[in-house]
């Protein structure tokens, strides 16, 4: 049986919010079966819980933000991507502010935290969403689609007219039956253009952004001294973002996602379009050991 997963232990970290620039305390706690991923604003009295669900996504300006009853949690996508990549179903994410800390701009530090806490398998079958037919959303020359696929695959294309991108691979296709999320995707950092920074900061955005948590590109080159972590790090980060955005469906996917210049907003529209067409998907579990599951996760390492 493929079982639901949570953490073995509680684990804490501190970082800064990418957009707020504020210090944020993050605590990840184990949660019972069928809880899902739940964000908890512990700085509020009473505390407010917001489930990581596509219907609560209210703002997609440069990040994915959830809100409920006027309370917001922003920049959830990299942490959500780490949960998806490691197959974590149930966890409470406690935050001391309205934004998940940016860490190094990738999902890598969150993967490390989760692995350090340890992964515990639980006494209930893991639920998957299986895509049964194609769903497409399009907007301003961008598109996002789901297709049936016996596994989980993400393909993405970006198209930046910029000297740096002239030498970069702008497409990636990752089949997770043969590729490790941790090794090949999780360390890809968010990226931004120096020319946009002033404009963003005037809107109180990217106040915590720096060379420590993003790839920064000026008019001609990558500013970061260390260069790139992967030769296709830009498009790989878009894959990472998409995995986090799709995990707002509440379950791991059996299917293929294809994005062309898609961002958080279009990814969310695709999730909502899928949920609205109930003949396009089904919930499946793998309780019988004789069934060959199309998706497998690494055995939980001992913490």
From Swiss-Prot:
Q: Where does Zn(2+) bind?
A: 78, 237, 241
Report the EC code(s) recorded for this entry.
3.5.1.108
GO CC annotations? Answer: membrane
Name the UniProt key words of this record, in alphabetical order. Hydrolase, Lipid A biosynthesis, Lipid biosynthesis, Lipid metabolism, Metal-binding, Zinc
What Gene3D superfamilies does the database record attribute to this sequence?
Answer: lpxc deacetylase, domain 1 (3.30.230.20), lpxc deacetylase, domain 2 (3.30.1700.10)
**For this protein, what reaction is catalysed?**
a UDP-3-O-[(3R)-3-hydroxyacyl]-N-acetyl-alpha-D-glucosamine + H2O = a UDP-3-O-[(3R)-3-hydroxyacyl]-alpha-D-glucosamine + acetate
Instruction: Give an example GO molecular function.
Output: UDP-3-O-acyl-N-acetylglucosamine deacetylase activity
Which residues constitute the catalytic centre?
264
Q: What class of enzyme is it?
A: hydrolase
**SUPFAM superfamilies, alphabetically?**
Ribosomal protein S5 domain 2-like
Q: Part of which pathway? A: Glycolipid biosynthesis; lipid IV(A) biosynthesis; lipid IV(A) from (3R)-3-hydroxytetradecanoyl-[acyl-carrier-protein] and UDP-N-acetyl-alpha-D-glucosamine: step 2/6
Give the family from UniProt. Answer: Belongs to the LpxC family.
Stored PANTHER family: UDP-3-O-ACYL-N-ACETYLGLUCOSAMINE DEACETYLASE 1, MITOCHONDRIAL-RELATED
**Function, in words:** Catalyzes the hydrolysis of UDP-3-O-myristoyl-N-acetylglucosamine to form UDP-3-O-myristoylglucosamine and acetate, the committed step in lipid A biosynthesis.
Would you tell me the protein name for this molecule?
UDP-3-O-acyl-N-acetylglucosamine deacetylase
Species source reads: Chromohalobacter salexigens (strain ATCC BAA-138 / DSM 3043 / CIP 106854 / NCIMB 13768 / 1H11)
